[in-house]
Amino acid sequence: MFGRAPKKSDNTKYYEVLGVSKNATPEDLKKAYRKAAIKNHPDKGGDPEKFKEIGQAYEVLNDPEKREIYDQYGEEGLKEGMGGGGGVHDPFDIFQSFFGGGGFGGGGSSRGRRQRRGEDVVHPLKVSLEDLYNGTSKKLSLSRNVLCTKCKGKGSKSGASMNCASCQGSGMKVSIRQLGPGMIQQMQHPCNECKGTGEMISDKDRCPQCKGEKVVQQKKVLEVHVEKGMQNGQKITFPGEADEAPDTVTGDIVFVLQQKEHPKFKRKGDDLFYEHSLSLTEALCGFQFVLTHLDNRQLLIKSNPGEVIKPDQFKGINDEGMPMYQRPFMRGKLYIHFSVDFPDSLTPDQCKALESVLPSRNASRLTDMEIDECEETTMHDVNIEEEMRRKQHQQAQEAYDEDDEGHGGAQRVQCAQQ
């Protein structure tokens, strides 16, 4: 972060917590921490807050860079450089890294090393509407990291590792830059030597199978079951199948369903919508057609005798929609949306034939005198949606231009005064 160099504040507290002088050597700090940590460990009836304070003091004073900041600026300097609480790790993790996994006398701590949770791995899974209607299974081959079986995830032949000398086993480094008089920049970043692990393994001791990486790649085939009625965006989870890592609870592999567009059917919840066009003759005189459903069943769709279908009319069929998720014997509705195709023009004879069977035209006819008093107009075809979009864009542009003319000058003058 960037900021003013913090004022000097109390820089003796951490030394007092460990019971050492300000000139204490790293060996003095280790001895003091060992004694204080064992005495105050919660598993031995100690005070958790005191134990946390001891771990915090040791982590700061055992790191040469953090200790330098603390000696110069106290806790305030650490907070400004590392955000809030000084970037301190879990006190139990510090204890475990110091004493190893055995805890007290090999019996192990009841709390143990706190494991972090690994990241979930998310994959999109494309499915058709037919897949969601009928249900399906898909086999997918994936590569993932698993703990090396030869070294059991230790990375070494002996199963041992050393704390990184560069970062004192914390995995993090703090760098300080002087930007100018009274201005400093402090940044925390992963240690370059150990790549943030806090551990180092000698070349001779590296595991020959994983080369010290602790994990190896494994190919695995997962069978994903897509159940009837599942939705676009729904997740299918395989717990604990993501990448493995030491001291880490393995995350999940998550498949997110992505439904492909269907040319005829649209889905809304548990209902299906189907578009169908009728000729004017069919709309007026009746129709029938075969609808091929998502499971390839053939449905006969026909109008009732004497029924007239209007443009944009909907008809519904019960229990022919989507299966309901985890209730596959219950289904939504199938709605058919009708559009009517009108002829582009009619001959005079066709008009007379239609007039003979259709309701007569409006009885009120205009006289020649009334027509002479009117102004003639010419109609043209329009795409109403495109027209509305164009008008909205034009109105928005005019409003923007008006606002710029009304306030732009005053704002520029104000900025000039500042």
From Swiss-Prot:
GO cellular component, one term: endoplasmic reticulum
GO MF annotations, alphabetized: ATP binding; Hsp70 protein binding; unfolded protein binding; zinc ion binding
CXXCXGXG motif repeat copies, ranges: 148-155, 164-171, 191-198, 207-214
Zinc finger regions, CR-type: 135-219
Keywords: Chaperone, Lipoprotein, Membrane, Metal-binding, Methylation, Prenylation, Repeat, Zinc, Zinc-finger
Topology versus the membrane: Lipid-anchor
InterPro entries, sorted: DnaJ, DnaJ_C, DnaJ_domain, DnaJ_domain_CS, DNJA1/2-like, HSP40/DnaJ_pept-bd, HSP_DnaJ_Cys-rich_dom, HSP_DnaJ_Cys-rich_dom_sf
Propeptide: 416-418
Entry's Gene Ontology BP terms: protein folding; response to heat
Covalent lipid sites (S-farnesyl cysteine): C415
Subcellular location(s) of the protein: Membrane
Claim: Plastid is one of the keywords in the record: no
Modified residues (Cysteine methyl ester): C415
Region annotation (Disordered) ranges: 382-418
SUPFAM superfamilies noted in UniProt: Chaperone J-domain, DnaJ/Hsp40 cysteine-rich domain, HSP40/DnaJ peptide-binding domain
Domain J: residue ranges: 11-76
Job of this protein: Plays a continuous role in plant development probably in the structural organization of compartments.
Protein name: DnaJ protein homolog 2
